[in-house]
Amino acid sequence: MDKVPFTFSGLGKIKLELDNLKKFERPQVIQAISVAREHGDLKENAEYHAAKEKQAFIEGHITELEDVTSRAEVIDLTRLSGKTVTFGTKVNIVDEESDQETNYQIVGPYEANLKEGLISVASPIARALIGKEVGMSVAVTTPGGTKNYEILTIEVPKS
């Protein structure tokens, strides 16, 4: 079984999500199934089928998150030097063509959230940045073509 890298806060969020699914989402969908059953014929009961579909999704998600948390490896960010881009570091880069600056933190695949500036260690841009230092340029191949970025800063987050 492969370990799944997490920041401390990222694993906490996943555990909260799992707890919410087990304590709130699961009981709600079980109740919805029970109510829908009372409406009679299950063959043509759209409410029942929708609730069963939601239950399958929730149970699948619970199984996935239980597996992921059992294989979680929290990376101690206090041990990072900040000299190179690594898992957990925050990096400020600039698009060499448009001069647009972007901030990212390199995190595990289950905590990635582009809106929050959290990118997966497995993403093309993170793979290009890993191991690089401030001032270095990287080329990132995307479906839209190759983009060139310069690393402006590397920071080790407080936690």
How would you label these PLM feature ranges?
Residues 75-155:
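Non-DNA-binding regulatory cores of transcription-related proteins
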Residues 21-24, 32, 36, 65-72, ...:
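Conserved, well-folded catalytic cores of nucleic-acid-processing
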Residues 1-19, 23-60:
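N-terminal cationic and glycine-rich segments that engage phosphates or anionic surfaces
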Residues 2, 38, 70-71, 81, ...:
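Glycine-rich, flexible loop/turn motifs
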Residues 46-79, 83:
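Internal alpha/beta loop-helix hairpins
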Residues 1, 152-159:
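Short, charged, intrinsically disordered terminal tails
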